[in-house]
């Protein structure tokens, strides 16, 4: 096993006090002679000394580490968010630790407790379930670790939250389809345990109501997140031979799966069936036909989430904010 070089080892090598070596290596050099300082620094480098950052941070009550907990990596949204947030936090002197919950509330719970044990200064989090771990969220916050929720937010938690206005953006998307003349729009929702799913479904229903089209429960298919799930759900629906002329999906990956199933049936997009979805990314412009999407303001979401978390780390929860961002509707070939 490798032996870690300690301050005591350097002091013993040079025959000087441990406190002198400690001051020199911590930057407190006011009372250390220049000649002694040079010897200490040279010896430390020669012996392979590395400062124990964990011990230093423990004494300073700060690790300068931020935890980011995400529910999945099926969609490209979270990787884009992490890249943006990490760049922002690094500029402020923070390192980022990432944990994935795999849509499992118990695994999410373990991730939160792990972050707490590692003494992160704060957590950016997208919840995998809107209710399951609310008790733990509140306890961790009460114990002094601020949490800012992004994208998948939760209720009954005294924490700042940043998300897209899912209701209004889904309403606008379905309204755009209806204005184009589509009459029978089916919806591939997200799982019920995600708060965004309810908001997007609500926008879909209210847009239909505005155009005096009766909401039909059978037009809301089984939930899907991945392309595989989207394909499976669409295949099951197509087997029923129910007429429809458009698909509105919870997320891009599920709609790409649905697109594959539709094209395998020989249906043309958009001549026979129009496709659109929420949570669009750059991927939507790389497929043929290109997808009509609502693009989430990921960069802005990361900026606001980081800003709020850094404010909470600096001064506690003086002001809790909920920020609902507008996305951008991008009309492409699929509609």
Task: Label every PLM stretch briefly.
Residues 1-2, 6, 57, 61-175, ...:
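Alpha-helical recognition/docking segments in bacterial nutrient-uptake
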Residues 1-63:
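N-terminal helix-turn-helix DNA-binding module of bacterial transcription factors
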Residues 71-80, 98-107, 129, 152, ...:
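Hinge/beta->alpha junction and helix N-cap segments in small-molecule ligand-binding domains
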Residues 235-335:
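Flexible loop/turn connectors
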Residues 91-92, 143, 208-215, 239-243, ...:
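Short helix-capping segments at alpha-helix termini
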Residues 44, 89, 207-208, 238, ...:
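Conserved hydrophobic residues forming the short capping helix/wall of the S-adenosyl-L-methionine
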Residues 184, 215-219, 268-274:
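Short acidic capping loops at alpha-helix termini that bridge into adjacent secondary structure
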């Amino acid at each position: 096993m490798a032996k870690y070089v300690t301050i005591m080892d350097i002091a013993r090598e040079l025959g000087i006090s441990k406190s002198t070596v400690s001051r020199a290596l911590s930057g407190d050099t006011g009372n250390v002679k220049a000649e002694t300082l040079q010897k200490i620094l040279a010896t430390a480098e020669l012996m392979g000394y590395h400062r124990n950052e964990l011990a230093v941070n423990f004494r300073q009550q700060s690790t300068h580490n931020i935890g980011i907990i995400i529910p999945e990596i099926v969609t490209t949204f979270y990787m884009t968010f992490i890249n943006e947030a990490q760049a922002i936090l690094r500029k402020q002197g923070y390192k980022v630790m990432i944990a994935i919950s795999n849509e499992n509330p118990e695994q999410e719970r373990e991730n939160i407790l792990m972050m707490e044990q590692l003494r992160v200064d704060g957590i950016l989090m997208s919840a995998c379930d809107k209710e399951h771990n609310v008790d733990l969220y509140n306890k961790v916050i009460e114990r002094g670790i601020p949490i800012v929720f992004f994208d998948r937010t939760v209720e009954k938690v005294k924490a700042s939250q940043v998300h897209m206005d899912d209701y209004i953006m889904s309403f606008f998307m379905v309204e755009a389809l209806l204005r184009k003349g589509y009459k029978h729009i089916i919806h591939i929702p997200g799982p019920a345990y995600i708060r965004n799913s309810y908001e997007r479904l609500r926008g879909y229903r209210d847009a239909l109501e505005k155009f005096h089209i009766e909401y039909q429960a059978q037009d809301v298919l089984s939930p899907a997140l991945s392309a595989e799930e989207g394909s499976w759900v669409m295949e099951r629906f197509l087997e029923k031979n129910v007429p429809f002329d458009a698909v509105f999906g919870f997320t891009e990956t599920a709609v790409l799966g649905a697109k594959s199933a539709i094209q395998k049936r020989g249906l043309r997009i958009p001549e026979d069936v129009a496709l659109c979805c929420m949570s669009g990314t750059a991927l939507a412009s790389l497929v043929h036909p290109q997808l009509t999407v609502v693009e989430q303001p990921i960069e802005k979401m990361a900026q606001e989430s980081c800003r709020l978390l850094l404010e909470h780390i600096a001064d506690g929860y003086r002001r809790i904010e909920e920020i609902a961002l507008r996305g951008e509707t991008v009309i492409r070939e699929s509609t």
